[in-house]
Each structure stands twice: as structure tokens, then as C-alpha cells.
């Protein structure tokens, strides 16, 4: 007898003509992202027609165990959406409902949500950020007896609070080492705002790889931006104006890399013949650029799954999981 093929969210997305992120948001019953009622209903109808067996009830049973995922902000195009998708899948595998709340970086709202969760059969809370960062959990101390873990953020002052984050240091080291292996000796780095833990760790990983290879860490080759295309364009232009140009550029995000592509094109610099280029976080658009962009795929899917499984298994030991991503080598860094 032929085994029935499992219906995935990718299958639903293709049939409904929407993204997997949209399917995830609809099936999670998230109301904090502006989706039309028609889109929501189309996704539910397609999921039903395909035989998707994990459709949540509109009203969960009173005794249904749930895990709440509170995220400081959520944008459907962000790779972090993969963490939410896999967290939901892990919850369902453990016969638990995952509910998602976007608290808009409003601590008072987050605390109010947690107080409401105390009245329900909530077995765990995942406090998440779409941006890898350090967080001060002082405001959340003693606010609940519900087990709580951090996803994509950590609090150095709370060593007993479990956290699950990507290893930005190791990832940046991996990208820079790849560019060096491809023959680059003057590698520039276009990064984000210095207050962000992600920016600091990526810069540190980049510098460590240079030092290991015996290459100088030249401050003139580092450009700080606020993550905007226009600033990346300006930063790249200024690098090209140096007396000794870089032969490779490592951008701390794929969005920064887009501004870099534009500046290089305007100045007649070819990728990769004249300049090797690599990005970070493996946005969907990275494969569509010309040439396709080498980037780091962040392990958000696994981190989201591990955070939920930790709560479902009711583990007591403090856990701090840091996972490296996967280098996706494409034509932008290959001569």
C-alpha cells in the first residue's frame, strides 16, 4: 500500500499562491500581521483540501496545553520567521498549541500578556527577538512561575535563564575564512549599528579570521551603517575611493549587500572578477541577484524547534544553545 505523502506548509503555500511565512502566520492564527480575511480563508481552505492534519481549532479546548511565543516585532520577510514556523511544528509534535504574540517591543504589554497567560494552561513562554541581541530581563524577574526561555537573545545577567541564539561570531569567521581561501587579502566589512550584539559579534568574527590568516585588521576597511541600502551604497563608494581598494567585501546582511551591488555596478566594478562579495542571513533575494550572493543561512529553524522542545520536555537545567549557520557559496565569491 502506498504511504500517504505528508502535506507541508510549502505545499499549502504553492497551492494557495502565497509565501510559506504567510501560511505559518495564518495557521498560527496570528492577528498582529496585516493579512486580508480573503488570504487567511484561502490558506485555510487549501490546507483543508490538501488534507493538512494540524489545523488548530478556532477556540482551543479549555484544557489544551499551550506554549506562548512573545516576539518584540515580526516582519514576514525576515528569516526569523523560520524559527516561528519550526517552533509551531515542534509544539504540535508534542501535542501542544503554540500561540504567537507580537508585543511591539512594549515591555508593559509583554508583562500584561504574561499575566493573562497565568490564567490559562500555559506550560512555557518563549520570549523572542527577530534581531540577535542582548536583553535586560530585570523587568521580567519574578513576573511568572511559568517556565521561560529566550530565543535569539540572551541576558548576561541571568545565567540560569535558558537561551537559544545563532553564533554570529563563528558565522562571520566562516564567511571571512571563505573569502581568504578564494584569494582575497584586503577584505572590507560593511556592518550595522555598534549597539547591536549581532554587529559586534560579526565584526569580531571577521577580525579573528583575518588575524588567524596573518592579515592586518585595517580600520579603514570597516564601514558602519544603520542597515539601509543607501548607507551601504555610500560605504561601498567610499571603499572604492581608497588608495588601495579592497579585493573583497563582507556585508553583515544581505540587504546591505544589495546596496553594495548597486555601488559596484555604478563604478564599473565586476563581481566576482574585480571584487569578491559575501552577505549574511541568506535572504530569499540572495539567490536572485546577479551574480547570486554567497551568504550564511542562519539556524533559526533548529533554534525555534529546540526552544519549544526544551519547554515541552520540562527540563530544569539552564541551557545556553549557540548554533553556527551554514555557508551557502554562490557565484559572487567564486572567480
Question: PLM ranges: what are they?
Answer:
Residues 2-8, 47-79, 94:
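N-terminal helix-turn-helix/winged-helix DNA-binding helices
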Residues 22-25, 60-75, 178, 186-192:
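Short beta-strand segments enriched in small/hydrophobic residues
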Residues 127-174, 255, 281-293:
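Flexible loop/hinge segments that line or gate small-molecule binding clefts
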